[in-house]
Amino acid sequence: AMATGIGKTRLMGACMYYLYKTKGYRHFFILAPGNTIYEKLRKESNPNHPKYIFKGLEAEMGRPKVYDGENYDSYPVRYEQMSLQFEKSSEIELFIFNIGKIFNSKTDSQFSFHKFKETLGMSFAEVLSSFDDLVICMDEAHRYYAPASMKAINFLKPVLGLEFTATPKSANNVIYAYDLARGAVEGYLKTPVV
């Protein structure tokens, strides 16, 4: 649990880097709760952005390939001879989506993310669930405990789920906590001027 403004997104990038270097994991699915945070994550996945998620780690890990709710149809995979054919790569691959792009709890409908694609022989969600190293990083994780959200997340069969939030639903799975008061005292937060 980390206070807002401390740097949860950069910590998320550091966790992905660590798992890439120590475990060889390459597939990371970043889940945002809504459009505002989704757009922020898309921007911060660009190396030219001042708050680049992997700032300082580029020399060690290269430039990750980024796919999101707008461009995932360009993911280099095809269905041939009864199996998926992936482009060979040793780079990290990020998949950035918001919960609304993968599942609509109001209508219980699945979006194109879950729909069968002839070129894949399955849905894109099934492609992701086929990775044996898929890690889900949940921004504002306290928002995903509803049954419909959990269903959408579990469908992807992640090897690991990392939750990033300022307001954890339960203290049982908090690995690290850094609160607002400590962030202010240690100078990591801007003091508001009135």
Language model features: what each stretch is:
Residues A1-V194:
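RecA-like P-loop NTPase motor core of helicase/translocase proteins
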